[in-house]
Amino acid sequence: FHTYDYERHFLSSVSRILRHQVDFNEITLPDRIVKVDSFPMGIDYEKFEKAALEHYKSTSEEQSELQRRLDHHLEATPDAKMILSIDRLDYTKGIAHRIRAYEYFLDKYPEFIEKVRLVMLAVPSRSNVPQYQKLKREVDELVGRINGKFSTVSWTPIWYFYRSMPFENLIDLYTSCDIALLTPIRDGMNLVAKEYIATRTNHTGVLILSEMAGAAHEMNEALIINPNNFDQVAQALKTAFEMPEEEQIQRNKMLQKRLRRYGVEKWAQDFMKALKHTRENRDSFKSI
């Protein structure tokens, strides 16, 4: 499992529903012992860090078209900050909730109108399934309504992409956006949160993360919110905008240290080590 909470709920279900004996994290069956453990998945930290560093060194001729557009918006509105939202278009990701929470934020704090832009990437998922087609229509309508409600001659509140993007463009987004707003209703881990932090090589930027994401258990320095509480999301956005750079650096350095230490290689090593240990215990169990 990704987190201890998931592991604990599974063991509780096995004990209460199936009535099997559970000792700490082991389930005793007539012919074997099943060991349950949690392994929070990491990322290839060095890959994202290196890509971000190379991105900052690139010349204007080497920049992607997306980066040029991002730079154009930054130059046109230098005081405006960009909020990043990246997800598969899936019910569990809470995209519609996030857009409504952003609308609530602009309604509650109108002083941020023209000073913020939500850069939202929704990656197509199960687009042939009617329920997902309905979700896409809902998201399209919400984006259109909010852009129509708040847009000015020189500013649009939501910049919306519905497509997959190559790795280089993801780095463009990670490095250009001041805030990452990731508010899934339920998510096993959410590696985007970790990738965003890994690319912040100057240690600035603020991560706002749903408490429903598995990554929240490892990333306490982020602003952890309930995605269903619009007032809490709005307050977190305001806090992120007003957070001093020194505090951003302090939080991100702690996050980066942890993510670097427990990357995808360490995750795989720990998993295989536990698997090998379980195999040895199984052989011992059979010999009894």
Where do the protein language model's features map onto the residues?
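Catalytic cores of carbohydrate-active enzymes across secretory and cytosolic contexts
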Residues: 1-288
